[in-house]
């Protein structure tokens, strides 16, 4: 009696399928979330500079106002710190969203390739 030519290897093929599905799940979720977190780290570093500059320029305008008593400098001394905080917040949001979308766009080919590998294993 002859045995089928593809006998054996069923357990290892099952483990490979499970690993491919796990890689697919980690890739689909992990890549966008990881890039989002990297964006948060980078943007927070950038935002600190914006906030420091806003408060520094606000303090400078306050000193100039105290020396000249021109009301525009007083207004600038009050507005510039808030402007620095706003710019810092915009930095964080922009970079987070950009890297999240980049992760989602990079995710599609990764998921497609992984699915094709899984489907190829199913056909064997």
Curated annotation (Swiss-Prot):
It is found in: Host membrane. It is a multi-pass membrane protein. Keywords: Host membrane, Membrane, Transmembrane, Transmembrane helix. The chain crosses the membrane at residues 15-35, 92-112. The keyword Transmembrane helix applies. One of its GO terms (cellular component) is membrane. This is Putative transmembrane protein 57.
């Amino acid at each position: 009696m002859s045995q089928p030519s593809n006998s054996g290897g069923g357990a290892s093929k099952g483990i490979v399928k499970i690993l491919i599905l796990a890689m697919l799940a980690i890739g689909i979720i992990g890549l966008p979330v990881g890039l989002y977190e990297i964006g948060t780290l980078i943007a927070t570093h950038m935002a600190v500079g914006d906030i420091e500059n806003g408060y520094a320029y606000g303090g400078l305008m306050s000193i100039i106002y105290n020396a000249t008593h021109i009301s525009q400098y007083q207004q600038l001394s009050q507005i510039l710190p808030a402007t620095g905080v706003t710019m810092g917040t915009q930095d964080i949001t922009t970079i987070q969203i950009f890297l999240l979308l980049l992760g989602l766009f990079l995710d599609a080919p990764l998921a497609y390739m992984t699915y094709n590998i899984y489907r190829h294993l199913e056909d064997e």
